[in-house]
Curated annotation (Swiss-Prot):
It holds the Pfam family DUF3719. This is Protein FAM149A. Residues 174-186 have a biased composition (Acidic residues). Residues 18-37, 54-90, 245-264 have a biased composition (Low complexity). InterPro entries: DUF3719, FAM149. Residues 18-155, 173-210, 232-264, 568-613 are annotated as: Disordered.
Amino acid sequence: MKAAVLDLGSLLAKLFETSTAPPAGPSSRPSGGAAAAGSGGSRAGTPLGTAPTLLRALAPDSPSASRRSPAPLLSSPYSRGSAASRAAGAVGTLLSWPSSPRAGKAPPQPPTPSGGGCSPARLVVPARPPSGPGGVWAALPRNPLQPGPGERELGACVAPGAGPRTLFLTLPDIGEEGASDGDSGDGEARGLSEGRRRHGFTVRSKDSLPTHFTRNVQKAIDKYTCKSLSSFSSSGSHTPTGAHTSWSGSATQSSTTGSSTERGSVYSWRDDEFDEASSQSVQRLLWEVEEMLFEGKVNPQTQSLLAECGEWTRRSLHLRVLGRQLILPTDKGVQHFQGSTPASAVHRPPLSACGHSSNIRELCISGSQIVPAALSASALPGPDDTGVADLTARSSLEEEVYHVDGKIEEYFAFDRKEDDDECLEQKPAQPGRKWRKLGLPPVSPRDCVKDAVAAEVFDHVWTNMVELLEELIRKHWETTLTEGKKQRETLKVAGNRFPHVLVPHAHADGASGPPSGHAEAHGISLASRLNPPQIHHFSSSFYSDMNGVMTIQAKPLQRRPAYFADRTQNEKEDKASGGGAGALSSAPHRLGRASDTHGLSPSAKKTPVPWRLPSLASDSQRLKTPNIYSDEVLRGTKLPTGVDHMASPLVQTSRSRFPPLVTETRGQNTAVPGCRLVSYRGRHLQNRVLSAMPDGTERSRLRERTATLERLSRPSTTHTFRQSDTPRKSSLTQMEFAAHTWTGQSILTGSQYVPKSFQRTTLTFKRRFQVTS
C-alpha cells in the first residue's frame, strides 16, 4: 500500500512537470496524430506502462467556440478505472487547451455498447481528425510490458455503424476482472486483493452470518459515515466525493480569469492552486482507502485500487523479518520499554508462526536463526483452491488483521514509566492474543459482532440446559415437598401427645423472667428428645413451615434491689439538707443497709445485677474529708475549761473542708526539710484526737464503724497510708491542743507561723460546734 501511494505520488509529480512544457504542434493526418501521441507518451514518462493517459481531443470547425467544462472521454458502463489512470486523466485535462485561442472542445460522445471482444472500459478517439488545427494527443506507454495470463492485449477496434468512423482503444484489464482471473488461476495470490474479497460481514455464502447479527453494526457504521461527511462538509472544505467536481470547476474558473496569452492558458494557474488540486486528490484517495480498511466500504475506485495492489503483490517478492531491537537507544531523555514477544501476521510466537506458515515463498527470520517454512496438511490448496484462503480469512476474522505485508513496531519515549504500561508488561504473554488496556470496551465492528454471536450462543446453550435439567429439578422439588409434609405431621402428633409438658415448662420459665430465647430453647430440646433424627432433618432441609420460628413472649420487668433505690434517695436527701442533722442520721441507715444486703431474697440473688459505681457528684463531696473527722464518728464533749471559746478544730461537720494541701505542704517543706510529711486525708490519723474521745467502748465502736465505712465507701487512692507507715507522736490533751493553737505554735513543726486559712477554719469550727451543742 505504501509503495502504491509512493508510485502514485511520483506519477503525479512527473505529470505536473510534463504539463509545464509547451505542447507539440497539431497534425492534420492520423499518422501525425499517432506520432504526436507517441511523442507525448515519451514525454510523459509514466512508470506504469499499463495505465495509458488520454488527452483531450479537439472538435472540428469551431473557431469561435468557447471553452466549456472539461470532461474526460473515458466512458465505462461500470465507472471503474485505475486510481493512477484517474489521476493521470485528471492531470491530462490540464494539457487539453491548445495553443490557439480559437480552438474549442466538442462535447463528450455518448458511451457505446461493448462489442467485438473489446473491454468494457474503452477510450473513444475520432479516427478521422478534422482538417483544421488540432489533433489527438495520447500518452501511450514507452515500454509496454507483455500481457500476463489474465490480461488482455492493448488493441484497437472500429465500431460499426453509420456516421464518422471511431477508433476504440482498449485498456488492459488489470482491474477487478484481471485480479479475479489471476486469483482463480493460481492460489499464490496474497495481499490486498485477497483480503478485499473476504472483507465485510457477508463475504461468501457459506461463511456469511445472519443479518440480525450485523444489522446494528451496519446501522452504526452508516450513521457514523453520515455524521462524518456532514461535519466534513460543514467545516468549509470539499467533501471527498465532490473533490473531483470542485477541482474541475476551479480549473475552469481559474483558467478563464487573469491574463491569458496565446500560450499562457496553463500558466494562468498559480502555484497554490496546483498544490490545492494535488492535495485534494490525495486526500480523496486516502479517504477512500480509510473507508475500505476500517468501515468495509468498497466502491469502484477502491476496487480498482485493490486490483492494482493485487497485481503489485503478485509481481513483487516479499521478505518478512521478525525480531527484536537489540541496540537500546542512547539518546538523552529516551528510555526503551521492552514489549511483548514480536509476533507474526496472525499474532503468534515467531517459531510457531514459522512452523505453520501458509506460503512457501516466505522466509521467516527470528533473531539470527533462519527457520524454513513448512506447509501443513490443512494449509495445502485443495481441488477448489480454498486451503490458503480459508486459513488467512480465519486468522483475519479472529484477530482482526486486515492485510499484512510487513510489521511495523512503534516505540514511544516517555520521561517516566506509566503505571498502566508497567501492569501490562508484568502480565505473562499469552500466544495468539492481543493486550488491550483495561477499561476500553471492544468498539470495533468485528468485536460487536463477536459479542452478539457469543450472546446468542449462550442463550441457546442455556435454554438447552434448562430443558435437560427441568425434569430433574421437578423431581427434586416433589421429593422435598413430600418429606416436608411428613415432618409437619410428625410434629403435630408430638405436640398433641405432650401438651402438658410444653406449656407448664414455658410458664415456669416466663415467671422467673429469662430472655425470650430460653423458653424456645427448652421447647426445642424437648422436641429433640422426643424425635431427634426427624427434628434435625426438618430444621436443615425443609423451610416451608414457619410455625415456631418466631416466638413473642412477655418479659417481666426486673426491679432494682431496695439497697440501690434507698441509696439514691439518701443521696438526694443529703444534697437537699446541708445541715448536721441529716448527716448524723445518715450513718445508721447506711450501716443498716449494709447489713441488709446479706439478707436479700433468693430471686434477687438469682439474676446477677451489674455493679454500678455511685455518682461522682455526691461521693466526691463526701470523700473529700476522711470519715474519721465527721460528726458521725467523733462526737465532741464540752469540757468545763477556761478556754470554752477555743473548741477543737478537729470536731467539724461532714461538709467542712481542710485548707488546701499545697500551702501546708509548702510550709512544711520550708520549715523542716527533713521532717516526714503527714497527710490530713489519711484514714488512720486518729492519734491526734485520742484525748478528745472517751476510753473503752468509744474507741472500739470507732474501729468497727471505720472498718464498715471503709468497705462501703469508695476507696481513695491519692493519699492512703497503712497503719504501720503512719508516724505516731505523743497525744495531746485538749488543754495542750488549745494552748498550742492559741499561742500560734504549729502542731507538726512547732513554729509560730499559722496560715490564715487555718485560723478562719478554726473560728468556723467553734461557731458550728456551739450551735450543734
